[in-house]
């Protein structure tokens, strides 16, 4: 049996925070605002995985009203989600992600992101795709106010 999940997330830029995307710290003058470390890509992947097994979203499992998740490492949150997915009897088929950002350029960091995500999801890097695009200076990402991401995951019964 196969299950498909889709995830989407957005975070706003702010001064004085690190920029962490896909589990990788990226040099930039601003980071993203969030209750956790605001890793927009890992949040998107978690939502896609949870959606594939009809288990809600990241906010249901790690609410931003719970102080236990304040400044949480999104890699740890994704590991917990992945453990839950595996407990339901699923493994990863493949994952395809898109980061939507005007700046900074993501290309130099894509392979590091793929490697980190493959580690977190206990799979071959060949099952992980990460790409980036801009909105040609349109909308909030084009105005460099934040970053968005999308992901689609295919899970299969073990």
Curated annotation (Swiss-Prot):
Pathway: Isoprenoid biosynthesis; isopentenyl diphosphate biosynthesis via DXP pathway; isopentenyl diphosphate from 1-deoxy-D-xylulose 5-phosphate: step 4/6. One of its GO terms (molecular function) is metal ion binding. It is an enzyme of class 4 (lyase). SUPFAM superfamilies: IpsF-like. 4-CDP-2-C-methyl-D-erythritol 2-phosphate binds at residues 9-11, 35-36, 57-59, 62-66, 101-107, 133-136, 140, 143. Its EC number is 4.6.1.12. A divalent metal cation binds at residues 9, 11, 43. The record marks 35, 134 as: Transition state stabilizer. Keywords: Isoprene biosynthesis, Lyase, Metal-binding. Binds 1 divalent metal cation per subunit. Its cofactor is a divalent metal cation. Gene3D superfamilies: 2-C-methyl-D-erythritol 2,4-cyclodiphosphate synthase (3.30.1330.50). InterPro entries: MECDP_synthase, MECDP_synthase_CS, MECDP_synthase_sf. GO terms for biological process: isopentenyl diphosphate biosynthetic process, methylerythritol 4-phosphate pathway; terpenoid biosynthetic process. Belongs to the IspF family. This is 2-C-methyl-D-erythritol 2,4-cyclodiphosphate synthase. It comes from Bacillus cereus (strain ATCC 10987 / NRS 248).
């Amino acid at each position: 049996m196969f299950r498909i999940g889709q995830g989407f997330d957005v975070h706003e830029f702010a001064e004085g925070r690190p920029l962490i995307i896909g589990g990788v710290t990226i040099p930039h003058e601003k980071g993203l605002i969030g209750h956790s470390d605001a890793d927009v890509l890992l949040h998107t992947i978690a939502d896609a995985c949870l959606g594939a097994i009809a288990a809600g979203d990241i906010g249901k499992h790690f609410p931003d009203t719970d102080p236990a998740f304040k400044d949480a490492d999104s890699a740890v949150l994704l590991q917990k989600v992945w453990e839950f997915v595996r407990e339901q009897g699923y493994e990863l088929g493949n994952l395809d992600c898109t980061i939507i950002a005007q700046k900074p350029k993501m290309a130099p960091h894509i392979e590091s992101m793929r490697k980190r995500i493959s580690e977190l999801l206990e799979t071959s890097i060949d099952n992980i795709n990460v790409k980036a695009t801009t909105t040609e200076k349109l909308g909030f990402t084009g105005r460099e106010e934040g970053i968005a991401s999308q992901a689609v995951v295919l899970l299969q019964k073990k």
